[in-house]
């Protein structure tokens, strides 16, 4: 019988095994690194977002904020509080009211942290003097620390005071900004504007300043377009469910009295003006957006205006996101 002398082949076997294990490890490392860099690249592609909101006015702001929370395509840098001094319910400091609401609302979401910053309680006095606040400084700071090729998306759900003030304080940040504003009425066929609208009236000087800012990337979700996004109360309350976040939104719907209209006294329906701009940024395929000339009383330049939204799909998208969100929120046992 012939025997194989393994002592002769053993070194070669070790070399082969070593090469095999090295190759295997290299492949494993490659997979790990590929997944890491893919995740990092995906994370880097998120939009850097600040929401500027008059959340103590109305209820639609809170639905808009809800849609933005933990949105995978957003890097939510902060929520700044805006003033709404023209409301008949206005206190001496409506920005502070909004700030307190923001703290209450975000506090309902366990393990979720986002900077909450107080903005100016007053509108601009003129188009040259900013209303310096923590919010305007926060906007400036966030714009400055972003890499040159990255944009800061400022979503204005109320008055334009904080954003306009930031630009007045630091005009060099203009090229870093994409400003999305919910405001004024717009006739898309005639390209005529009606600035007699709540958000616009709360700081008409600031609104005009943004319209007059040459080179500023300004995108408008007009009241004309956003009014198409309407939620039904019974459907909304059923979908909100019994949880801290849903109960807060239901209470807000029930208790807030709409001073601007005598229609639908029972509040069976609510226009989600502000949710429309969040939905549009997340799902641009659900919108039409076109380029228009600014109003005749403003600097002659081009801005972008949303002319239509798919309100049904936008609402469906909200509820899909909401259900995912509340799955991470413990139900109130009481």
Please identify what each model-predicted range represents.
Residues 2-3, 13, 23, 27-30, ...:
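Short linear sequence motifs
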Residues 3-43:
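Bacterial Sec-dependent N-terminal signal peptides
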Residues 41-334:
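N-terminal acidic, glycine/proline-rich low-complexity segments
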């Amino acid at each position: 019988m012939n025997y194989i002398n393994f002592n002769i082949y053993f070194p070669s076997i070790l070399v082969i095994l070593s090469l095999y294990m090295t190759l295997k490890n290299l492949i494993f490392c490659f997979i790990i690194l590929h997944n890491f860099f893919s995740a990092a690249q995906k994370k880097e592609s998120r939009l850097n977002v600040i929401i500027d909101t008059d959340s103590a006015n109305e209820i639609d702001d809170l639905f808009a904020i809800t849609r933005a929370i933990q949105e995978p395509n957003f890097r939510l840098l902060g929520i700044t509080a805006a003033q709404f001094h023209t409301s008949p319910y206005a206190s001496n400091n409506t920005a502070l009211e909004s700030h307190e609401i923001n703290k209450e609302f975000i506090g309902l979401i366990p393990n979720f942290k986002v900077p909450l910053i107080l903005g100016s309680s007053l509108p601009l006095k003129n188009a040259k003097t900013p209303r310096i606040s923590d919010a305007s400084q926060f906007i400036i700071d966030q714009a400055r620390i972003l890499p040159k090729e990255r944009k800061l998306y400022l979503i204005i759900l109320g008055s334009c005071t904080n954003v306009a003030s930031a630009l007045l304080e630091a005009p060099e940040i203009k090229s870093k900004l994409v400003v999305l504003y919910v405001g004024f009425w717009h006739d898309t066929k005639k390209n005529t504007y009606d600035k007699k609208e709540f958000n616009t009236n709360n700081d008409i000087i600031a609104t005009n300043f943004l319209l007059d800012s040459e080179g500023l990337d300004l995108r408008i979700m007009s009241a004309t377009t956003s009014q198409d996004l309407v939620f039904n109360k019974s459907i909304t309350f059923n979908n909100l469910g019994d949880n801290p976040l849903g109960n807060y939104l239901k209470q807000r719907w029930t208790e807030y009295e709409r001073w601007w209209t005598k229609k639908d006294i029972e509040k069976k329906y609510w226009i989600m003006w502000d949710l429309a701009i969040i939905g549009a940024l997340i799902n641009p395929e659900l919108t039409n957006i076109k380029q228009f000339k600014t109003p005749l009383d403003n600097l002659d330049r081009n801005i972008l205006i949303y002319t239509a939204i798919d309100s049904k799909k936008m609402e469906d998208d909200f509820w899909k996101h909401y259900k995912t969100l509340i799955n991470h929120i413990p139900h109130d046992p009481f």
